[in-house]
């Protein structure tokens, strides 16, 4: 049961990304192939030894057989952090989302009264990170954008599973680092009850400073932080977002 909406995808086999490609409120959903979400079901191996002979005979006789064991003990994949990039909304035209199969990039291109804008993302195999580039417009208008992590409760299909028992925090500093760190549910018998996951984003702003912002605390029991910070870039020539996700 996926927790991610449709979008453009990028990845290198371990690090993965889904981006919505919206012009002024884009979302970048970071993933890692090792992210699996525990559930509260018993972690026991089913005893199926007494079914072996009947299954063998069914195969030999080309008959049918039914597996009545429910797979409730299987852990499912889950997303990492969901980064939101906000820019001032304007009337726009020429909107296009694209995948460049030669460069392995996904991106969005559109035009407003400040010119044509291009935002592109790819996941590096050599470096094991995802990189997003936001360049100034073709009219040389600079980049102004705000970066925040979305709350878990806003994720697609939230509330249908054990994600309601995750606890998480957000961090950001003036050096350009943003971190989303979460603790898995502490279910009895779970191999991951002491573990969690994190997504770290490093924002590089050419020609402008990075400043911290403060947003209202999330109104949800999952949030364990004392603040809800983000970062803002104003009038930059180019902005890079370098991101990586992993288990903790």
Residue ranges and their predicted role:
Residues 1-248:
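Aromatic-residue-lined binding/catalytic grooves and analogous aromatic/hydrophobic interfacial grooves
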């Amino acid at each position: 049961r996926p927790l991610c909406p449709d979008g453009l995808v990028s990845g290198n086999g371990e690090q993965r990304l889904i981006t919505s490609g919206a012009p002024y409120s884009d979302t970048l959903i970071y993933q890692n192939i090792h992210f699996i979400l525990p559930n509260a079901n018993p972690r026991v191996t089913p005893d199926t030894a007494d079914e072996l002979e009947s299954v063998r005979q069914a195969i030999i006789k080309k008959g049918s057989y039914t597996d009545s064991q429910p797979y409730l003990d299987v852990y499912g994949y889950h997303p990492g952090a969901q980064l939101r990039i906000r820019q001032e909304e304007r009337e726009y035209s020429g909107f296009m989302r694209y995948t460049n199969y030669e460069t392995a990039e996904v991106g969005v291109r559109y035009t407003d009264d400040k010119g044509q804008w291009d935002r592109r993302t790819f996941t590096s195999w050599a470096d094991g990170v995802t990189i997003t580039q936001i360049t100034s417009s073709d009219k040389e208008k600079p980049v102004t954008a705000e970066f925040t992590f979305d709350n878990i409760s806003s994720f697609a299909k939230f509330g249908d599973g054990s994600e309601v028992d995750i606890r998480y925090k957000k961090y950001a500093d003036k050096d350009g680092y943003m971190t989303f760190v979460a603790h898995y549910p502490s279910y009895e018998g779970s191999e991951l009850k002491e573990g969690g996951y994190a997504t770290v984003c490093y924002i590089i702003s050419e020609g402008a400073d990075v400043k911290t912002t403060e947003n209202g605390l999330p109104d949800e029991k999952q949030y364990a932080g004392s603040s809800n910070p983000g970062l803002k870039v104003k009038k930059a020539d180019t902005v890079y977002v370098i991101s990586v996700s992993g288990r903790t």
